Amino acid sequence: MTDAAVSFAKDFLAGGVAAAISKTAVAPIERVKLLLQVQHASKQITADKQYKGIIDCVVRIPKEQGVLSFWRGNLANVIRYFPTQALNFAFKDKYKQIFLGGVDKRTQFWLYFAGNLASGGAAGATSLCFVYPLDFARTRLAADVGKAGAEREFRGLGDCLVKIYKSDGIKGLYQGFNVSVQGIIIYRAAYFGIYDTAKGMLPDPKNTHIVISWMIAQTVTAVAGLTSYPFDTVRRRMMMQSGRKGTDIMYTGTLDCWRKIARDEGGKAFFKGAWSNVLRGMGGAFVLVLYDEIKKYT
């Protein structure tokens, strides 16, 4: 293998391992966030059964579905997240070579910053094309509030993918893809762009104390998450449309979804579960720091 291939493989492995560990740790928070986002568009959750907030959700889930249901959809998430995050990190460095080749970060700061934004956004969008059906399945599995057996909408990852494919074809597995690309570019641009720029401004980036790295990463993930959150809410709502027919369809398209959420639920609805997303972001910050630490030893 060439040095470039070895470097790419190390990026892929380091990013994937770090992501799988952190995602499993924050899976319960992830499920709470998803339920708060999509409950209004769920056929299983009637108006009188909707969760009132994070605490209500955390209390009711183990009572109604069992403690292990906090990790519902986590297997799909780990399977999805390993290639997603690994590809993001690997492609990010490849895109950095394209956008930042010959750019001096000290004398061309804004060009350097723009290059980091572009490389981060392009990496996220590229990865999404490959793993979107898994992201879709993870959302639908996490949104399934049936207790067991016949009450469940899907029996697992394979059952979810097969049922939606039979019902709606490949298009059903990519429901909400366009708004996802918009959101992922905004999120990844901030996630990678600001983080790399901030670290690049430090005197000795490679030997930065882990606490400083974590603080930078925590700020970046919180800002990036809140900025792109409305896009995430809309894409999750669109994912809930797959498998529906006739009058069961709530939104005719992405623009209709934006309009109806704003009209019927108000602007706050775009940020349902946002606080749990900030908590979940601690896992994202941990990924960035862990990735840098793993790379030091590879």
UniProtKB/Swiss-Prot annotation:
Monomer. Component of the MMXD complex, which includes CIAO1, ERCC2, CIAO2B, MMS19 and SLC25A5/ANT2. Interacts with AK4. Interacts with ARHGAP11B, thereby inhibiting the mitochondrial permeability transition pore (mPTP). Interacts with TIMM44; leading to inhibit the presequence translocase TIMM23, thereby promoting stabilization of PINK1. (Microbial infection) Interacts with HIV-1 Vpr. This is ADP/ATP translocase 2. It is found in: Mitochondrion inner membrane; Membrane. It catalyses: ADP(in) + ATP(out) = ADP(out) + ATP(in); H(+)(in) = H(+)(out). Pfam families: Mito_carr. Solcar repeats lie at residues 6-98, 111-201, 212-297. The chain crosses the membrane at residues 8-37, 75-99, 110-130, 179-199, 211-231, 274-291. It comes from Homo sapiens. The transmembrane helices are not perpendicular to the plane of the membrane, but cross the membrane at an angle. Odd-numbered transmembrane helices exhibit a sharp kink, due to the presence of a conserved proline residue. Residues 1-7, 100-109, 200-210, 292-298 are mitochondrial intermembrane. Residues 38-74, 131-178, 232-273 are mitochondrial matrix. The modification N6-acetyllysine is found at residues 105, 147, 163, 166, 268. It comes from the Eukaryota.
